[in-house]
Design a protein with these regions (language model features):
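Hydrophobic alpha-helical transmembrane segments of small proteolipidic membrane proteins, enriched
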Residues: 1-27, 137, 143-144, 148, ...
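Post-HExxH zinc-binding segment in Zn-dependent metallohydrolases
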Residues: 120-142
Length: 224
């Protein structure tokens, strides 16, 4: 692939990444103003879904920030951000159900989760070390160091690639549960789906940027 095309694709991916980041915040804020007919808070919905799956030991807690919601397998906790925890909106319920989906994945030993956890230590090390190895390889003209740097960056890309099915599956579980348990219907369900789709696209954008950066590193290494 010609290098100028690679750079054009990388610029396009960066723009797409910025768009998805803005879009997910806008979509969440829009549907966080749309109350559900059930009138239950996102935290209560999360608790209900956890209990219906026998996950009584998983706690639901509040964390600061916006869109900082996550599941922490170390503490077995579904952490919901301040705008989500007490909200009765369809957007908040979608986010909460998604995080519960991650808790269910861990409980069921979902295969992509196990693969991602196995890669995590290398990806964490690589996120801070790859650039050091790559630069040292250039400075000292040592291809092996550049190769190590590229390999570590490839581990980051692989981690992001494995993250995609994890996130999409969590959203699928969330939407299926929301429908099957009669939590949201009609326009409310559609709004929750749009919220989760917008969030999922941020992972697609991040992977696209990382993959193109990896190709650029490989191309520059071969050129040198």
């Amino acid at each position: 692939m010609p290098e100028f095309i690679l750079y054009l694709l990388l610029i396009a991916a960066f723009i797409f990444s910025i768009f998805t980041s803005i879009n997910v915040k806008g979509t969440f804020r829009k549907y966080n103003k749309m109350p559900s007919s059930r009138g239950m808070s996102a935290a209560d919905i999360a608790r209900q879904i956890l209990d219906s799956n026998g996950l009584y030991n998983v706690q639901v807690t509040r964390v600061s920030g916006e869109l900082t919601d996550h599941y922490d397998p170390r503490t077995n906790t579904v952490a919901l951000s301040a705008p989500v925890y007490d909200s009765v909106s369809v957007g908040a319920i979608g986010v909460a159900a998604h995080e519960v989906g991650h808790a269910i994945q861990y409980a069921e030993n979902y295969t992509p989760i196990r693969i991602r956890m196995a890669i995590l230590p290398v990806a964490q090390f690589g996120s801070s070390a790859w650039i050091l190895f790559f630069i040292l390889g250039i400075v000292f003209n040592m291809p092996i160091l550049r190769g190590i740097g590229i390999g570590l960056f490839a581990a980051i890309v692989l981690f992001q690639l494995i993250t995609l099915p994890v996130e999409f599956n969590a959203s699928h579980r969330a939407l299926a549960t929301i429908k099957n348990q009669g939590i949201l219907f009609g326009a409310e369900y559609t709004a929750a789906k749009k919220t989760l789709t917008a969030a999922a696209m941020t992972y697609v954008a991040s992977l696209a940027v990382a993959l193109l950066q990896l190709l650029r590193l490989i191309a520059s290494s071969r050129r040198d």
